[in-house]
Amino acid sequence: MSQEISYTPDVAELLDFDKKHIWHPYTSLSSPLNVYPVKSAHGCKLVLDTDSPVDVEVIDAMSSWWCVIHGYNNPELNEALTKQMLKFSHVLLGGFTHKGAVNLVQKLLKVIDEPSLQYCFLADSGSVAVEVALKMALQSNMSGEATKNRTKFLTIKNGYHGDTFGAMSVCDPENSMHHIYNDRLSENIFAQAPSIVDGLPTSQNGFEDHWNAEEVTDLKKQFELHSDKICAVILEPILQGAGGLRPYHPQFLIEVQKLCNQYDVLFIMDEIATGFGRTGEIFAFKHCQKYQDQHGISPSDQIKVVPDILCVGKGLTSGYMTMSAVVVNDKVASRISSPNSPTGGCFMHGPTFMGNALACSVAEKSMDILLRGEWRKQVSAIENQIYRELYQYIKNPDNGLIGTVVKRVSVIGAVGIVELYKKTDPEWFQKKFISKGVHIRPFNCLCYIMPPYVITTEELTKVNQVLIEVLHEWKSHINQ
């Protein structure tokens, strides 16, 4: 059932000011997309600020750009933030420290659970984390005679790593939203991206194990051609995010690790979108060990896939505050900290809000929730439900979507992806979704869902049903 949205004069006035003066993400000021005012939120629902005498709620299937993993107005996170707010909101991390920062890093390292990753830099946002990671890799290589001339980054096409300059330089150079800046960015090295899979062979839903060794041919070629220039490899493990929402086979990541080992190249993993359970493992790179375990490879013969530099963000604070972190191994930390390094051992980066006490308090509690382990059952249930209700429906040709308007459908952990043949009309789609009580924000040819882990079975059923309904309406719309 659709609902009409209307506003009180006061709210309409605010929306008018917003339209004239506020720049929204990836939007034109001269012809901005419609926006919907939110007055409160709880669980998985946003409450719109309308003139209705009863609350108009929409289920947020996007987790506010993938970060609100524990849901809105979470009592535990609220309490942690409130307690800290009454003590102090922020203190310079240069020359000072505080219990919140120390406790957060202790628990973050427990969540990561990799003995080699022991050194943490707290940053502001996902893009800043990537900038820090690139800078760390460069400075680490400056400290070695054999590596000091390695200044290029190797990545794969269809990647997305953020909107700042260094991050843009490792985004897809042809099809990304940043391609217009190409001739103004540092020039890096791009290999062909791996093929998309419908789902992972590590999934409980029994996706077929399609691996083709040819997938790494171009990557190997780039290593052979440029090994003396490659400072580090950077990529999004297992699921490429805003560059196309492309899940790929764990074996590809294993092969990348082999090449990094062979050529002694640092490996940066950008888990800003995929980290903290989103793909079904606490971090996406851990699918590699699971895949090798499934194939009966003994631990002594397995390829240990683990980054030298790990970027995390989004779910770190579950959307309460902006925060990210970069975690590195001893190899990177000791090179940067060497008295013989160009800076005398200092890493020359220091955000104003580094280790913000409010952000640390809520991030620490977010880590507590993850350490309890409930996320695994939640994400597993979400994946199963998306598979049954959305994936299987769309894959059935009798339902008239696959091969007509839908090019492919994938499910990986708490992510459902529908790629269309035609580019979406965001205004048309958002109006349809909101009127039916669901928030899904499409981009390019993609409609996808990444709900909070706390979404109920009933809420997710509604999300899946509304998405299917709107896809059928889109089919009729474009065929008019």
From Swiss-Prot:
Protein family (similarity comment)? Belongs to the class-III pyridoxal-phosphate-dependent aminotransferase family. BioA subfamily.
Q: Which residues carry this modification: N6-(pyridoxal phosphate)lysine?
A: 314
Q: List this protein's GO terms for biological process.
A: biotin biosynthetic process
What exactly does this protein do? Catalyzes the transfer of the alpha-amino group from S-adenosyl-L-methionine (SAM) to 7-keto-8-aminopelargonic acid (KAPA) to form 7,8-diaminopelargonic acid (DAPA). It is the only aminotransferase known to utilize SAM as an amino donor.
Q: In which pathway does it act?
A: Cofactor biosynthesis; biotin biosynthesis; 7,8-diaminononanoate from 8-amino-7-oxononanoate (SAM route): step 1/1
What is an example of a GO molecular function annotated in this UniProt entry? dethiobiotin synthase activity
Q: Which reaction does it catalyse?
A: (8S)-8-amino-7-oxononanoate + S-adenosyl-L-methionine = S-adenosyl-4-methylsulfanyl-2-oxobutanoate + (7R,8S)-7,8-diammoniononanoate
Q: Which Gene3D superfamilies match?
A: Aspartate Aminotransferase, domain 1 (3.90.1150.10), Type I PLP-dependent aspartate aminotransferase-like (Major domain) (3.40.640.10)
What protein name is recorded for this chain?
Answer: Adenosylmethionine-8-amino-7-oxononanoate aminotransferase
Q: Which residues bind pyridoxal 5'-phosphate?
A: 126-127, 270, 351-352
Might you give the EC number(s) for this enzyme? 2.6.1.62
* Residues engaged in binding substrate: 160, 350, 441
Alphabetized InterPro entries for the sequence: Aminotrans_3, BioA, PyrdxlP-dep_Trfase, PyrdxlP-dep_Trfase_major, PyrdxlP-dep_Trfase_small
Q: Which NCBIfam families match?
A: bioA
- Give the record's keywords alphabetically: Aminotransferase, Biotin biosynthesis, Pyridoxal phosphate, S-adenosyl-L-methionine, Transferase
GO cellular component annotations, sorted alphabetically? Answer: mitochondrion
Q: Which cofactor does it need?
A: pyridoxal 5'-phosphate
